Structure formats: C-alpha cells, structure tokens
From Swiss-Prot:
Residue numbers binding FMN: 65-70, 80-81, 86-87, 109, 144-145, 189, 199
Role: Catalyzes the oxidation of either pyridoxine 5'-phosphate (PNP) or pyridoxamine 5'-phosphate (PMP) into pyridoxal 5'-phosphate (PLP).
Cofactor(s) required for function per UniProt: FMN
Flavoprotein listed as a keyword: yes
Pathway as given in its UniProt record: Cofactor metabolism; pyridoxal 5'-phosphate salvage; pyridoxal 5'-phosphate from pyridoxamine 5'-phosphate: step 1/1; Cofactor metabolism; pyridoxal 5'-phosphate salvage; pyridoxal 5'-phosphate from pyridoxine 5'-phosphate: step 1/1
HAMAP family reported in the protein's UniProt record: PdxH
Encoding gene, per UniProt annotation: pdxH
Name assigned to this protein: Pyridoxine/pyridoxamine 5'-phosphate oxidase
Species of origin: Sodalis glossinidius (strain morsitans)
E.C. number: 1.4.3.5
Residues at which substrate binds: 12-15, 70, 127, 131, 135, 195-197
InterPro entries in UniProt: Pyridox_Oxase, Pyridox_Oxase_CS, Pyridox_Oxase_N, Pyridoxamine_oxidase_dimer_C, Split_barrel_FMN-bd
Length: 216
C-alpha cells in the first residue's frame, strides 16, 4: 500500500443540528420513523429510502448490502430481491436481519432488528407490475450473485428478453420476491455536540414498546 495521503484520524466534525429528547418520541416507533423519513425526503437526500441490509450465512459470517425500502407500516418493513441471491439464501437459513438507514446530512441514523418473512405471490406481483417495464425485464436478466464473464452478457440478455416480452405484460419471474421484516427493536440516533449523541431504543415488550435512552 502506498503512503496514506489523507490523515483520516483527524477527519471529524461537530454535530449541531439539534438533539432528540424523550418528549420528541412517539409511542410507536414507526410513527417516529415516518416523521424522520419524511424529513429526509423533504431535505432531498439522495436515496433516502436506501438501507443497509445485514444477514448472516450458515458459518456466522455477516454480510451487508444496500437495498431500497419499498413499503412500511406497523406490520413491518418491505423490500424486494432476487430469491436466488445471497441474502435470500441467508434468510432461508436464518431469518434474523438488521436494517440501517444512514441519513448523514440530518445527522441521524436508524437501526432496525427483526425477522424476515417471505411475501405472498399476490403482494409481490402487485409491486412487480408497478415497476417501470425495463425494470421488470431487468429482473429476468440477472441470476443475482452468479459469476458472469462480462457486462455484455447482461446487456445481450436484456435485449433478447425485451424482444421476447415485446407484446403484453412482462410475467413475474418465479425467482423474484420480497420480504417483510417484523420489527423486534428499533434505535433512533441523533448526533449531538461534543459527541454526546442522543440514542433511544424501542424494544417489543408485553405487546407494546419499552423505550430506553442509551449512552452514546
């Protein structure tokens, strides 16, 4: 490795956008999440719905990747993926999952812990056919996480399938689906001055939510 040109140990900034107090919290974590997501969208953060999805393989090796949140309500958070993907294989073995939303500009982050469950075909089909047509075709192209010789393989396959599906609706691939993450815990983090950040953890307890303030 060449000599490090950037002193990353010295890179830091103060967090000054405000704190998070217990009086700001909602009884349901999804209500606070909705407020924060709306503010992230209003601030025109790029990919405000992007979340890091953490899964674990059968050897205990954790993996992360960015995926877009496509729906949320009090039943959980929903995302879609190729069912032949690495993440799908992990979830088949171990449904425990983490989601992380990094909203750097707002000096906020949200951590979600829960369990993933496959969506019904009806739910998946409804969303699939709401996507742009080229995105529907793109879902057919990729056998996610498989090895390919070049990008040209994907581009050629896309053109082939675009011609094949030129007439009528693009069918739902059998290897494409979605997951709903039922939430067991959710942490809200707001940056604070002098590294005294505000953290609140919601945990399911006795049919409701128990809230703890955590030290930064």
């Amino acid at each position: 490795m060449t000599e490090q040109l950037i002193d990353i140990a010295a890179l830091r900034r103060e967090y000054t956008r405000g704190g998070l107090r217990r009086a700001d919290l909602t009884a349901e974590p999804m209500d606070l999440f909705e407020q924060w997501l709306k503010q992230a969208c209003a601030a025109q953060l790029p990919d405000a719905t992007a979340m890091s999805v953490g899964t674990v393989d059968e050897n205990g090796q954790p993996y992360q990747r960015l995926v877009l949140l496509k729906h949320f309500d009090r039943q959980g958070m929903v995302f879609y993926t190729n069912l032949g993907s690495r993440k799908a294989a992990h979830l088949a073995h171990n449904p425990r999952i983490s989601l992380h939303f990094p909203w750097h500009v707002l000096e906020r982050q949200v951590l979600v812990l829960g369990r993933a469950e496959r969506l019904s075909v009806i739910e998946v089909m409804k969303y699939f056919h709401s996507r742009p047509r080229d995105s529907q075709i793109g879902a057919w192209v990729s056998r996610q996480s498989s090895r390919i010789s070049s990008r040209g393989v994907l581009e050629s396959k896309f053109l082939e399938l675009k011609q094949k599906f030129a007439q009528g609706d693009v069918p739902l691939p059998s290897f494409w689906g979605g997951y709903r993450v039922s939430i067991e815990a959710m942490e809200f983090w707001q940056g604070g001055e002098h590294r005294m950040h505000d953290r609140f953890l919601y945990r399911r307890e006795n049919g409701g939510w128990h809230i703890d303030r955590l030290a930064p």
